[in-house]
Amino acid sequence: MYTFPEKGLSEDMVTDLLKEMRSRDCPYDRLLSTMCTRPHPVAVRAYSMFLETNLGDPGLFPGTAEIERRVVGILGSLLGCSDATGYVSTGGTESNIQAVRAARNSSGRRDGNIVVPRSAHFSFDKIADLLNLEVRKAELDESLRVDVGDVERLIDDRTVCLVGIAGTTEFGQVDPIGDLSELAIENGIPLHVDAAFGGFVLPFLEKDCMWDFRAEGVQSITIDPHKMGMSPIPAGGLIFRSSDPLRRLETETYYLTVSRQASLTGTRSGAAAAATYAVIMHLGIDGYRKVVRRCMDMTEHLVSEARAMGIEPVIEPVMNVVALRVDDPPGVRRALLERGWHVSMTREPKALRLILMPHMTDENLDLFLSDLEDVLISLRRGG
């Protein structure tokens, strides 16, 4: 049982308490299951500079508000829209909620449905509950991209939004956004792209594909700086092609320095926007290309070494997400955890899921591969 202390502790004692609890957390150098990573040092410094700021009341913090406008503009241009609108959110879940809410509000319906891929993030299940919308899940094709024909089958006159994924959580796959865009335009339905992970990967890959605002039917995109953008948690981005959907989210804020507010949360730390701006300005396109290239090099190395062990990926990796076909994925996962490695699993098909993030080193990856081989040999022998 925890109670409010009668008398406070010294700062040193509080620090010791925090250090002890922090020591129980998993070190990033053993994490292959997370889509988050250590924030860049320049982002950490920027975050600490803006701890006191509140973007929920931007008139009090005009400099911080300008930073957010710049971040939205920069992310919009990265995603193929030079006059985008939006805001810095807490992450992908909030951005997805707000994107669908904007689409629902634009439709004028309160009894609608949305069509998402079966591979969609669980935030869309939360959306069903929060917004009282039916979530229809379209099947995937053999490459684990959404089946556009099934999406078309699920659309009716109550459909308020279509969703495509650019970097699925389990497999890192990219849906055929161009085809979904055409479907959205034909039916007069907005298309939202969840690029929470892929948003800071796809623009920096050598191979380009149509997944962003270049597809005319795309109304909104979720992109998370606190993933491959290397900004501290929580830092998300909700980017709209135009201002109208954002206005559909506004509510009156009579006691603040602005009369209306579109964000889901009221009080919003400006630190996330500042940190995101700092790391973007520091790394630039060239810096992010190097970060992504290194992650893809590790991805290719992992797949090559896995194949040498007789293990194939479920799909050829599109980005730095790998799903390996192993016998008894739960058993392999447990055995790796006993050796200090944190990996996860996919659902269908069941496989070992690995994310090669910037915090992983070549040396630790080779240690992991050695342990993986030992685990597989042991399990095959029944050990």
Curated annotation (Swiss-Prot):
GO molecular function terms listed in the Swiss-Prot or TrEMBL record: aspartate 1-decarboxylase activity; pyridoxal phosphate binding; tyrosine decarboxylase activity
Disulfide feature: none
Enzyme category, top tier: lyase
InterPro entries: GrpII_AminoAcid_Decarb, MfnA, PyrdxlP-dep_de-COase, PyrdxlP-dep_Trfase, PyrdxlP-dep_Trfase_major, PyrdxlP-dep_Trfase_small, Pyridoxal-P_BS
GO biological process, one term: coenzyme A biosynthetic process
UniProt modified residues of type N6-(pyridoxal phosphate)lysine: K227
Pfam name, any one: Pyridoxal_deC
SUPFAM superfamilies cross-referenced by the UniProt entry: PLP-dependent transferases
Cofactor field: pyridoxal 5'-phosphate
Keywords, sorted A to Z: Decarboxylase, Lyase, Pyridoxal phosphate
Origin superkingdom: Archaea
EC number(s) per entry: 4.1.1.11, 4.1.1.25
Pathway(s) served: Cofactor biosynthesis; methanofuran biosynthesis; Cofactor biosynthesis; coenzyme A biosynthesis
Catalytic activity as recorded in UniProt: L-tyrosine + H(+) = tyramine + CO2; L-aspartate + H(+) = beta-alanine + CO2
Physiological role: Catalyzes the decarboxylation of L-tyrosine to produce tyramine for methanofuran biosynthesis. Can also catalyze the decarboxylation of L-aspartate to produce beta-alanine for coenzyme A (CoA) biosynthesis.
NCBIfam families linked to this entry: tyr_de_CO2_Arch
Similarity comment: Belongs to the group II decarboxylase family. MfnA subfamily.
Record's protein name: Probable L-tyrosine/L-aspartate decarboxylase
Lineage, opening ranks: Archaea, Methanobacteriati, Methanobacteriota, Stenosarchaea group, Methanomicrobia
